[in-house]
From Swiss-Prot:
This is D-serine dehydratase. Inhibited by hydroxylamine and aminooxyacetate. Optimum pH is 8.5 (at 37 degrees Celsius). It comes from the Eukaryota. Its EC number is 4.3.1.18. Its cofactor is pyridoxal 5'-phosphate; Zn(2+).
Length: 376
């Protein structure tokens, strides 16, 4: 019922996506990968939609990374294939993984411990299928993965490749340079990207020297892939995800310019409180998330108000937000009750996860509704 609607008529809070900007972001990342001569495997966890997946893959429906089994099933149902679960293989849900592996031409899993490999071997796929395994490397991010300098990493890769080749195949190595999210500017982002790339390439070289074939080498994060370095051309693929929308955090990091941010959360003014100098709006943390509130930032770190740098977000409860003038008197006449403001969220992935529908717009009108998958 909302197709063709003007944005200021939408029920709020409403998550909106500028179609032109998202298309431009997707094409720019594809072009970066083409220029490097590497494959783009877009991570779809930011949007979790078939439409976003089509946009990111250029319509091929092949070669994506997902963060949950629910996403994997959803995209498989939507005709996607060559799906990588970018999460250490959940051995408690191995039957679900096996079902996807049998169903798809290529369903890839990550592992970083021998016990996970043993679980895969205890659950052979049969029917001529093999588990497609990537070794997860930790090149400084400090989350999942084995350190490439640890001798156990080489031993695990050798075991994946050699212990049961009729059941398990080593596809490649996978590293997420999430430590780029602690950067401020292209130079520091590229320094981490270079360290990660070199660590991955050195590990692949060590594998090959040991007689272990390693066809694929993949790294990713939106900051690193937004400022690619020449060394990345020696990899086989990149796997960023947030870039399709970008967000306030990415502009602060230096990954993008403000005009590259496609996502907004529309909110209505629902109250004036002159004695406090505050506007009340109908967007709380349930429509925005609390990402960005850390490091002493408080609510103002969670979002910026588009077109109104004089306003700041000072309070967030579940369904309410409070705005103040950053350095003077609030002009309530400029923001009557019922007027609509647009918030630029700090973290698009977290904010998008709060909404059941995205209103995609062009020239001020809704042109599509995207419905994301939810759950795990």
């Amino acid at each position: 019922m909302w197709l063709g609607a003007l944005l200021d008529t939408l029920p709020t809070p409403a998550l909106t996506i500028d179609r032109t900007t998202a298309h431009r972001n997707a094409e720019r990342m594809r072009e970066r990968c083409r220029a490097l001569g590497v494959r783009l495997r877009p991570h779809v966890k930011t949007h979790k939609t078939l439409e976003g997946g089509l946009l990111a893959t250029g319509g091929t429906r092949r070669g994506i990374a997902v963060s949950t089994l629910a996403e994997a099933r959803f995209f498989a149902d939507g005709g996607f294939d060559d799906i990588l679960l970018a999460y250490p293989v959940p051995t408690a849900r191995l039957e679900e993984c096996a079902g996807l592996a049998r169903r798809l031409d290529a369903f890839h899993v990550l592992l970083d411990r021998p016990e996970a490999l043993a679980s895969l071997r205890q659950r052979p796929l049969g029917h001529g299928k093999r588990w497609l395994v990537w070794l997860k490397l930790d090149c400084g991010n400090g989350r999942a993965g084995v350190r490439p300098t640890d001798p156990a990493a080489l031993e695990l890769a050798q075991a994946i490749a050699n212990d049961a080749p009729e059941e398990v195949t080593l596809v490649g190595v996978y590293a997420h340079c999430g430590n780029t999210y602690g950067c401020s500017g292209a130079d520091t982002i590229q320094a981490i990207a270079r360290t990660t790339t070199n660590a991955v390439l050195s590990f692949v070289a060590a594998l090959r020297q040991a007689g272990v074939p390693c066809p694929q080498a993949s790294i990713g994060s939106t900051p690193s892939c937004s400022h690619p370095i020449p060394e990345m051309s020696q990899l086989t693929e990149l796997h960023p995800g947030n870039y399709i929308f970008y967000d306030l955090q990415q502009t602060q990091l230096g990954s993008c310019q403000p005009q590259d941010v496609a996502i907004r959360v529309l909110t209505r003014v629902i109250g004036h409180y002159a004695h406090r100098g505050q506007l009340l709006v109908d967007c709380g943390w349930a429509a925005l998330s609390l990402h960005g509130a850390g490091a002493g930032q408080g609510p103002q770190g969670c979002a910026a108000i588009d077109g109104h740098p004089e306003l700041r977000l000072v309070g967030l409860t579940q369904e309410h937000g409070l705005l103040e003038h950053a350095g003077g008197q609030m002009d309530f006449g400029r923001f009557p009750v019922g007027s609509v403001l647009a918030l630029i969220p700090y973290h698009a992935c977290a904010t998008a996860a709060m909404h059941p529908v995205y209103y995609v717009h062009e020239e001020g009108k809704v042109v599509a509704l995207w419905h994301p998958v939810r759950g795990w």
